[in-house]
């Protein structure tokens, strides 16, 4: 293991605590603003509590990016310890968080490398975990960057949400489209393209949208759909997680399934009831 490389990510990546502890990864949190109070994402409020509030109250959550000061503090700490820093960021197109890190890097002497996953939530977290595995194997930063670039060309990630309300609030869809969609019980199928959330399809009802999402993924994969690993992202709907697990086992026959909980800052823009799958093209 290359003990001199310190991996840092932001809370947009939704890396679970087991991975953070296993690979000694530091997280720079974004800020969630809920009912007039500020919370550090993943520190001051857990996803389970957050989604409960969303379902039970008429809450209007907002988020703010991680700041220059946050990155300067953590970069200072580890460069003074003689560490080489590898910061793996959530999509720079979706938030100014990565730019905050770039500005902090300019003002600090030391070896700091920044990799933009161009993705969000478990799509970004997956890159963090893969990088950590490679660093543990003794790979160099250059080798890690090359491997991550190759992964970018091969992965397929799609997800769906329970309600269109939060996408409307975030300006992802129009008020008219949200109103019609809610009336007809239309659920969107989404992906992260060029760092931003975009719609790839839709279906009526929860059951239909999951099946449609799987069909869209299979189309992307082509003939060879069996997988060594499948990554499942979910928010607060454990039944949906189990349903996705059953379907993933049946369709993709993976040797391993890993789970990521969609955190509060992503959840503020997606709402509760998120479910998604990440797989790979051969």
Residue ranges and their predicted role:
Residues 3-6, 11-26, 31, 93-113, ...:
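Mixed-charge interfacial surface used for oligomerization/domain docking
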Residues 5-65:
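N-terminal glycine-rich anion-binding loop in soluble enzyme alpha/beta folds
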Residues 38-107:
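Class I S-adenosyl-L-methionine
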């Amino acid at each position: 293991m290359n003990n001199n490389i310190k991996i840092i990510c932001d809370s947009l990546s939704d890396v679970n605590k087991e991975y953070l502890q296993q690979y000694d990864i530091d997280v720079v949190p974004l800020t969630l603003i809920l009912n007039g109070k500020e919370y550090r994402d993943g520190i001051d409020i857990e996803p389970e509590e957050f989604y409960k509030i969303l379902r039970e109250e008429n809450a209007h959550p907002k988020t703010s990016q991680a700041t220059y000061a946050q990155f300067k503090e953590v970069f200072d700490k580890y460069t003074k310890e003689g560490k080489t820093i590898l910061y793996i960021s959530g999509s720079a197109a979706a938030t100014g968080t990565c730019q905050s890190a770039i500005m902090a890097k300019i003002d600090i002497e030391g070896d700091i490398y920044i990799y933009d996953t161009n993705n969000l939530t478990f799509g970004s977290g997956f890159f963090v975990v893969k990088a950590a595995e490679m660093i543990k194997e003794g790979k160099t930063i250059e080798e890690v960057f090359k491997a991550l670039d190759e992964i970018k060309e091969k992965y397929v990630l799609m997800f769906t949400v329970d309600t269109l309300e939060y996408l409307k609030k975030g300006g992802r869809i129009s008020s008219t489209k949200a109103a019609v969609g809610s009336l007809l019980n239309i659920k969107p199928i989404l992906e992260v393209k060029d760092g931003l959330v975009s719609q790839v399809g839709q279906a009526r009802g929860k059951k239909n949208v999951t099946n449609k999402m799987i069909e869209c993924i299979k189309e992307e994969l082509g003939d060879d759909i069996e997988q060594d690993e499948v990554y499942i992202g979910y928010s607060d709907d454990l039944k949906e997680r189990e349903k996705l697990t059953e379907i993933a086992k049946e369709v993709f026959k993976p040797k391993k399934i890993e789970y990521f909980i969609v955190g509060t800052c992503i959840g503020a823009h997606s709402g509760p009831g998120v479910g998604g799958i990440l797989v790979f093209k051969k």
